[in-house]
Amino acid sequence: AAAVAIETLKIYDEIDLIGHVKSVGPHLQAELQRRFANHPMVGEVRGVGMVGAIELVEDKAAKKNFDPARKIGPRLVKHGEEQGVILRAMMNDSIGFSPPLVITKDEVTEMLDRVERSLDALSVELRRESIAAV
């Protein structure tokens, strides 16, 4: 097991994985902020390095969470699957991002394009439900 770990560390060094993460991580964080901080359904964008999350809220100004019975996070995950992106729903309708450490900046852009399309589809779905409930 130790030999495998040592070989893995050698590969990380050969491909400069740490340098790559130091380059791509800030790009991921900046893109998360740029794309989602002002979205009406996003109450908070948070993260560090190659890990991030967006918190989905019903009312951005009041930071009011959705009713848990509506399962908004899992519904966004489903839309993500339809867009070809894997999302992780967490407590309080937060969606987590933890892409592979070898992801490129272009792939981050593509991933977040798909997340945006998923969030847009969920927004349309929720508006339809609101109209139907009236």
Where are these regions (language model features)?
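Conserved N-terminal phosphate-binding loop of PLP-dependent enzymes in the Aspartate aminotransferase
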Residues: 1-134
